[in-house]
Amino acid sequence: METPKTALLGRTLDEIQQIVRNLGMPKFAAKQITSWLYDKKVETIDEMTNLSLKHREALKEGYEVGASAPVEEMRSVDGTVKYLFRTPAHNFIEAVYIPDEDRAILCVSSQVGCKMNCKFCMTGKQGFTANLSAHQILNQIYSIPEREKLTNLVFMGMGEPFDNLDEVLKVLEILTSEYGYGWSPKRITVSSVGLKKGLERFLNESDCHLAISMHTPIPSQRRDLMPAEKAFSITEIIDILHNYDFSKQRRLSFEYIVFKGVNDSLIYAKEIVKLLRGIECRVNLIRFHAIPNVDLEGVDMETMVAFRDYLTQHGVFATIRASRGEDIFAACGMLSTAKQQKEKGVTLQ
């Protein structure tokens, strides 16, 4: 049986330099390799033609580019495309391409499943299986047909990014470094429930935008919706955020899914205004996509508008996020769950 080769994709410049040293290649070869990977986006080592044949052959003995295409895709009438990738362990992860007027956004996953077990999230119902490597995260960007159209990236797919922060930060380095994609950090948003250790490290080591999953300003209710509240409360998150400047390049936003009869009254809007006082931020109101066996419902647009208007009138900038891909398993984790269960002979109800 042939020994699996190690992927070069997802390696930082420092890691490529170590590989080059180990193989006795000249030091400058590291930047040549990263250029082939992240600028020219080749699929094979043979395409790295400014490396000598000898060095290409040496590299090929233990390494490969490591790009792998999606195994399935679903296309919405609104142009949204949900891609399904298979991991080497035969699990499935999702990435979603969202064209939006003059922007093209890709939503990527950071884990197989998730430990957070948020009541409203299909991925949480899967439980946690594995962290994705930087290679597996970056492959979601590298291997879709629309990769050259992308203007923005959001870590809002499967998993909790701060629970896999080593690999996420590695991807952010590759995306924003001169040797990598050369993107501005302003093109990237990382969403989190707000894990304390990860939150502070992310804010100190990255300049990318931050989105915090709030969903209710009431700690006792948030514990019911999001068990992570028990470990690190929304008020503690806010206390940390007060120590950082969000008035310039970096943007801070709070995600708020509006549930019928749960968190949709203006009483909650009033509490949000109090909670966020003194922080430069925005609130993104989100429609709920129903998932099986969860007794939560979304609200009508009139309720969303009233909630948004109250926040805006009281000094908190708020938007209503347009729903996309409703005809293709819109809720995060739905497609991967359906695929996993299909392979096991189970039907998603």
Residue positions per predicted region:
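Auxiliary Fe-S-binding modules of radical SAM enzymes
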Residues: 1-93, 242-251, 258-349
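Conserved AdoMet/S-adenosylmethionine-binding subsite of the radical SAM
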Residues: 145-152, 157-321
